[in-house]
């Protein structure tokens, strides 16, 4: 199981929102779709990633008004990707090294096909997670 590819545990339904979307609109989309992140777009390109935690920590806690603050203004610009063939162990290692809770998952052509999060990994059997930890 330690060789499980991230494609087997990732979330496949990626939600894209334009950068001018407000925080309250993005939060409503996340709530309605039961997701914790959205990919921010600027025209046809990906401009960043915003998580539910970003909205709370980078915006609300800082006093930014959610009705007028855009997701582009708080988006993480550095989007860390792994290929869908990467193992869960490799994804865990990448998250640890980069201090992130989510990785974008791409195919061999670098097309986004999903997102793998700590929540996705938490759903794995304990034996798989322990196996990845022991190799660190």
Give a label for each model feature.
Residues 4, 21, 50, 69, ...:
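Short beta-to-alpha loop/turn elements within the nucleotide-binding domains of ABC transporters
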